[in-house]
From Swiss-Prot:
Protein known as: Calmodulin-lysine N-methyltransferase
Family listed: Belongs to the class I-like SAM-binding methyltransferase superfamily. CLNMT methyltransferase family.
InterPro entries: CaM-Lys-N-MeTrfase, Methyltransf_16, SAM-dependent_MTases_sf
Tissue specificity note: Expressed in discreet spatial and tissue-specific patterns including root tips, leaves-tips, floral buds, stamens, hydathodes, stigma, anther, siliques, apical meristems and germinating seeds. Also observed at high levels in the root stele region.
């Protein structure tokens, strides 16, 4: 075995151990920085800052983060989310019980920020539309769509019941920002075969970082086809890095189920500019790698 690969694997296990034990010693931090690709600010497209972190024991794992949208009026959204490195065994037990991943609890993933930024930049695309976000995590993109685009309805969904509870709280916190847009949270599992009240009802599906696990690809592709309007123009907008061959295999499932897709690498000037800066090296995102970190845009349609 390649000793470098073995060392990297050991350090990744150390990252997981830190998340469970909440270690923070300097030696461990130095070692894991060498292998971790975790970003401190993501693509830094939507300014954010922690505005509250309660010291009480029942709230010690949570923080309130303020996101200031870079649009006219600079509206703010407040999201309650987990602080870093605080996963516990209960999180993994729930993940196993529901046959889901718990990545939505880990952090605010960079592609979610890119999705949110892209959507707020194209309000006309969403105006008057029914929108659903899949695998939303804390719901940043869905909340941005609700606050900045005049969509008629936004459903923010995830398969993890713990995550859905966070979404509900975040919707309630920001309810005054949505104007006339109806916003709700939903626990949605991609292997559900009965979604009669949702079948063929959405104009737009959005999602980010949802294609990493190949075992979910077939169900995800089926869910997309089931949710999109079949007799009117509709689309799904996915943002995801290549991550080896995972994205390629997902797109094959999309094609096999009878949907069509367009893959775009450079879809926004500001995102691309930030990407080029990170490729050259930036301490805010150690070990940045295009294949692993840069989200491509996949536009999926029925092509009626």
């Amino acid at each position: 075995m390649d000793p470098t690969s073995s060392s990297s694997s050991a350090l990744r296990w150390k990252i997981l151990r830190q998340a469970l034990l909440r270690r923070s010693d300097s030696q461990s931090q130095t070692e894991t920085k060498r292998i971790s690709r975790k970003a401190t600010q993501g693509f830094n497209l939507i300014p954010c800052q922690v505005v509250d972190s309660s010291p009480q024991s029942d709230k010690s794992r949570e923080a309130s983060v303020c996101y200031t949208l870079p649009i006219t009026g600079s509206p703010k959204l407040y999201l309650t989310q987990r602080v870093d490195n605080c996963s516990d065994l209960n999180d993994f037990e729930i993940s196993n019980r529901y046959n889901i991943d718990n990545t939505g609890l880990v952090c605010q993933w960079p592609s979610e920020e890119v999705l949110a930024y892209f959507c707020k930049s194209q309000p006309e695309r969403f105006r008057g539309k029914r929108v659903i976000e899949l695998g939303s995590g804390y719901g940043l993109a869905g909340l941005v769509i609700a606050a900045a685009t005049e969509a008629s309805e936004v459903v923010i969904s995830d398969g993890n019941p713990q995550v859905v509870n966070y979404i509900k709280r975040n919707i309630e916190t920001n309810s005054m920002a949505f104007g006339g847009t109806s916003v709700k949270a939903m626990e949605l599992h991609w292997n559900q075969h009965q979604l009669s009240e949702l079948t063929n009802t959405f104009d737009i599906i959005v999602a980010s970082d949802c294609t990493f696990f190949k075992e979910f690809h077939k169900d995800l592709a089926r869910t997309i086809k089931m949710l999109l309007k079949a007799k009117k123009a509709s689309e799904a907008l996915f943002f995801s890095p290549k991550r080896g061959d995972s994205l390629e295999k997902f797109m094959k499932e999309i094609k096999d189920i009878g949907l069509h897709y367009i893959l775009t690498e450079n879809y926004d000037a500001q995102v691309w500019k930030r990407h080029e800066t990170l490729v050259k090296g930036d301490e805010a995102w150690p070990n940045y790698d295009k294949n692993h970190c840069y989200p491509l845009l996949i536009q999926i349609t029925n092509q009626i």
